[in-house]
Amino acid sequence: MMMSSRSSVSLGVLLLLAVILSAGAADPDILTDFVVPSDTDPSGIDGAFFTYKNLVTGNSGDPAKLTVTKATHAEFPALLGQSVSYAALVFGAGTVNPPHIHPRASELLVVVQGPLLVGLVDAARNGTVYTQTLQTGDMFVFPKGMVHFQFNNGTDVVARAFSAFGSATPGTISLPAALFGSGIDDTILDKSMHTDQATVDQLKQDQAPPSPRPSPGSSSSAAAALLPSRWAITLLLCFAASYYFYF
């Protein structure tokens, strides 16, 4: 009976842990309708605070390259706490958005000028790759944290798309840059990729180290600090519960 009771309580603790972790994975909740940056006078807030005009005008880069213009909290402070952000993408002919992940958000992409080849990797199904050639008006969802890519395989046509994210700071981790531009020891890369030093050197050649992101304002830092706090509290609860019910 004691073991059954402990098992039931342990199951309850695990379920509670799952709920806490699920809540911590999203953007931190805010207690107001919107967040005013610490360097902004609330009495001066007007419609301009909720307006962002650079998504399209800032997206007229080199048509032979991939150009990504973001509207995240870093560019559009009014998004803090709103769990949403946006990006405009212009794919020159033959350009690719390399395999990458967004650790904090799902992505919903809509093509406004196609075609555009997209794909994602399902690690839970032995690395199955799902691809689709999208035409103008088509949409595609990339679940949070899954490796995905976009490729304009046309020879003379520019492709354009917009992406919505379920976080004000979705984050982007480019796999080529993370592996070959981050300073990981060459021996580790050699052994991990089952290749040789010459191949690793060649792969590193075009991967410059990622630029550090600017430090966010104090309001952003305070909100972002909620997430680590939740993890710390969760771990403490877990250890405490395990100790209590074991002994």
Swiss-Prot record:
One of its GO terms (molecular function) is manganese ion binding. Keywords: Apoplast, Glycoprotein, Manganese, Metal-binding, Secreted, Signal. Mn(2+) binds at residues 100, 102, 107, 148. SUPFAM superfamilies: RmlC-like cupins (SSF51182). It holds the Pfam family Cupin_1. Residues 1-25 form the signal peptide. InterPro entries: Cupin_1, Germin, RmlC-like_jellyroll, RmlC_Cupin_sf. One of its GO terms (cellular component) is apoplast. Gene3D superfamilies: Jelly Rolls. Oligomer (believed to be a pentamer but probably hexamer). May play a role in plant defense. Probably has no oxalate oxidase activity even if the active site is conserved. Belongs to the germin family. This is Germin-like protein 9-1. It comes from Oryza sativa subsp. japonica (Rice). The lineage of its organism: Eukaryota, Viridiplantae, Streptophyta, Embryophyta, Tracheophyta.
